[in-house]
């Protein structure tokens, strides 16, 4: 079946693409990571940082002078390349950064026990910001709108990659984030506007469902750990021409891939740089103007916006 082109400018209001009057395709000066300096010893983990959005998120935290960066990916060669680029970036700005890597399968619980051990041994158990960026667009049979034609293993892999891994990350790493030495107490889950979609010929059902579950999980974590100071935010990174997007999406949808890959990283740093409990448990878009968003703070909290609920 031919895939129709998608025009996000005509998206329904409930998708929230234009929740702020101003939107961006590149980081604005107001959220430039290089204008941020994190406290001494600040430690960040980016799960799924071998390429694309995750790689650029890690670079944003280096620009913001985070001293400790841990990056993970399934592919060791990708991690080696990103590690070198992060270290070079730090040298260019005259700062010291410790970059650690871990080859892991984000869908396996044992990967997170190894990550926890790495943090315990190498960083005294400190974890300020956790970014869960593992995920990927479906391939193969999952693009069919007919569920009976999908492959079971492909379906399960898609759900595990886009959602279940976030549960493992929270289960094993949140205890570290609640320790006194971990000051940031921030989790950013990279989701997708695809969580709004139901048309299987535009977004595969497994991907939409996985990201929708991630959004709800973000809300649950944010509410259940609010009294312990944890801030959890789901972020749609924009639509960028990443290797993953170009490799999984049909060519007819490539027209929407116009957002800068560094935009999401800048927003992640904006979330982390100060306590933003007013957006905890909520969904935001990296394309939104963060000043506009902050101006809506009272409205968002009072009306409990940017959360999923049934319209009745």
From Swiss-Prot:
SUPFAM superfamilies: NAD(P)-binding Rossmann-fold domains (SSF51735). Induction: Expression is significantly up-regulated at the end of late growth phase, in the presence of Butyrolactone I. Expression is positively regulated by the pgm cluster-specific transcription factor pgmR. One of its GO terms (molecular function) is oxidoreductase activity, acting on the CH-OH group of donors, NAD or NADP as acceptor. NADP(+) binds at residues 46-47, 171, 207, 211, 242. Its EC number is 1.1.1.-. Disulfide bonds: none annotated. InterPro entries: NAD(P)-bd_dom_sf, SDR_fam. This is Short chain dehydrogenase pgmD. It comes from Aspergillus terreus (strain NIH 2624 / FGSC A1156).
């Amino acid at each position: 079946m031919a895939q129709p082109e998608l025009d996000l400018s005509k998206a329904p209001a409930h998708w929230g693409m234009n929740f702020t009057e101003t939107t961006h395709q590149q980081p604005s000066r107001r959220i430039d990571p290089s204008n941020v300096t994190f406290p001494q010893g600040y430690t960040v983990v980016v799960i799924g940082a071998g390429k694309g959005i995750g790689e650029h998120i890690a670079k944003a935290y280096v620009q913001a002078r985070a001293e400790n960066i841990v990056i993970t990916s399934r592919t060791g060669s990708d991690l080696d390349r990103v590690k070198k680029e992060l270290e070079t970036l730090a040298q260019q700005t005259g700062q010291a950064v410790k970059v650690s890597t871990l080859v892991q399968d984000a869908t396996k619980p044992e990967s997170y026990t190894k990550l926890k051990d790495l943090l315990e041994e190498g960083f005294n158990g400190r974890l300020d910001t956790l970014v869960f960026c593992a995920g990927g667009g479906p391939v193969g049979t999952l693009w069919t709108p007919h569920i009976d034609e999908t492959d079971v293993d492909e379906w399960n892999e898609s759900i595990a990659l886009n959602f279940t891994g976030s549960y493992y990350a929270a289960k094993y790493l949140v205890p570290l984030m609640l320790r006194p030495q971990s000051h940031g107490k921030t989790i950013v889950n990279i989701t997708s506007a695809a969580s709004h979609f139901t048309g299987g010929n535009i977004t595969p059902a497994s991907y939409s469902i996985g990201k929708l579950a991630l959004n709800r999980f973000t809300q649950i974590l944010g509410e259940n750990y609010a009294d312990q100071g944890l801030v959890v935010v789901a972020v749609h990174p924009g639509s960028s021409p990443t290797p993953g997007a170009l490799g999984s999406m049909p060519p007819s949808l490539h027209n929407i891939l116009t957002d800068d890959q560094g935009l999401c990283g800048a927003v992640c740093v904006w979330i982390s740089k100060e306590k933003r409990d007013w957006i905890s448990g909520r969904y935001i878009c990296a394309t939104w103007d963060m000043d506009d968003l902050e101006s809506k703070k009272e409205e968002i909290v009072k009306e409990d916006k940017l959360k999923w609920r049934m319209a009745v």
